[in-house]
Amino acid sequence: MKQKRIALLLALILALSVCGCAADKPQTETAETTAAVENRTAAEGITVTEEELTQTAQWLMEQIPQPTYGSVGGEWAVFGLARSGVAVPKEYFESYGENVAAYTAEHGGVLHAKKYTEYSRVILAWTALGRDAADVGGFNLLIPLADFDQTVFQGINGPIFALLALDSGAYDIPENTAGTTQATRDGYVDYILNAELPDGGWSFAGGDPETDITAMALQALAKYRDRQDVADAVERGLTVLSQQQEENGGFVAYESESSESIAQVIVALTELGVSLTDSRLVKGGNTLVRRLLEFRTENGAFRHIPDGEEDVMATEQGFYALVAVSRAEQGKSTLYTMTET
């Protein structure tokens, strides 16, 4: 099972630095949680309740009592909680801020020599807290993203998350003083477009399109559809996702269905403003949200795979996908748009 998970998440390793972080005991779906899912309006299947958000938020805070710098148990949990509207003790966010500021200062502002998604991830969490990414422990974390060559060094994840981070707070790209290629938004967009596969969609290392990478590319491109080449690529990407979707509403890769893939597609649709009941991504009457909630346990956590254990990483992604849905239902700005309420 662990080997399957490593294979399934190969495309995410450089972006999210994922690792297996499951709780000790497995959870089985109860009659109560099954009924809760089945009782959702069949015509919509997209409702996210305040109780669901609150319960999952509480689970995350219990599992991650001291959030700090890190791809699991760090930025993504803080990011989701900050964007959720759920009541979170101010000390929780303050603790994260202090921990990350101290870590950044201790390392001289260098979070990673090669993997610049580390900067993007922190920028997203920092911005979600209403803070300025130009001052994290006394360091401007936007500066590394001004270096185009270093940002794209790790592949497609680099420009995807650079755009999400820069656009989250409508940040200007600083001047690149490293003597390498100056980054621009159009440059990052072009890199993503040039990486599109012949029949649409994206993957980390070529070959067949991967659900997670395709969905994340669409998230990053969402704000650039005034360019016709972007709009066309987005439509091709949506077609790929539609073709990949299973009859139950989920997605399978490397012989395993994962909640994270569903979560990323949900976020992509909300960023694009595409209805979660769009016929292209409803199979057999099963919506994305309905299927995602079937991975949710009675404690509010999410499983990575249908019969798996409660998992921190899966819950972080499942949670912020539900937050994206909730924000869309309330007419609020999208998950990654933090310049508006």
Task: Enumerate the language-model features and the residues they cover.
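Hydrophobic helical h-region of N-terminal Sec-dependent signal peptides
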Residues: 9-15
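C-terminal motif of bacterial Sec signal peptides marking the signal peptidase cleavage site
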Residues: 17-20
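Bacterial Sec signal peptide processing site at the extreme N-terminus
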Residues: 23-32
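Terminal, non-catalytic domain-edge segments
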Residues: 32-55, 291, 306-341
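Long, well-ordered core segments of solenoidal/helical folds
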Residues: 45-68, 89-112, 134-154, 179-201, ...
